[in-house]
Amino acid sequence: MINTLSILIPTYNNVCVELVKSLQAQASLLYSSSDSLSSISHFEYEILVADDGSTDERTIEGNRIINTLPHCRYIERKENVGRAAIRNFLAREAKYTWLLFIDSNMNVISHQYLANYLKEKESDVVYGGYQIKRDAETRERLKYNLRYIFESAGTQNGNHLQRQANPYADFHTSNFIVKRSILLKHPFDERFSHYGYEDVLWGKTLKNNHIPILHVDNPLGYEHF
């Protein structure tokens, strides 16, 4: 059972205050009620948001409110080091045994999101997947967006059983839990300084080192295309 958790959010030119507030509200409830829950005892958490050298000053200023939230810290970094290096940095900064990595452009769609992860068996890596918003307004707004059309047509990212059939290939860094010791021993390859592929290579690293990935049905929402 997971009872200590560092929630780690890398961000770049994106205000993620609402995401952090949603996560903090769930974590705070678990923290305050942990003594009375038979399945979760002495729950401790932190939420760290690392700004990877954002160039938009309004974005940086907007995210500074995160520092006023309990158990939350907004870390401003001047240099843009890329998706792999910023995740490795967050892992080093974290103080708890388990790390939950979330992309800053995701949104929480379940009130039980954190509780679902805490109840999972202690697999070294657990991936929850993501869910594309498919309401009428979003479909109309993005009807000519090729990436949205492609992602919406797919189902495997929302179906954990299909993902589990090919666990290392169907893995993304947008929503997963990992033991801190695993990531420190097998960090992301920092040669990937731009968008993409760091999760593909890390999946291969896990496979080569016989570290299993458990796929579960615990998605975050995604609508930024």
Question: Can you say where each PLM-predicted feature lies in the sequence?
Answer:
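A conserved hydrophobic helix/loop-capping motif in glycosyltransferases and polysaccharide synthases
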Residues: L5-S22, Q26
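Active-site donor/metal-binding and catalytic loop motifs
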Residues: S193, I211-F225
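Short aromatic/hydrophobic "clamp" motif used to bind/position activated sugar donors
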Residues: L99
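Conserved donor NDP-sugar-binding/catalytic core segment of glycosyltransferases
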Residues: H111-K143
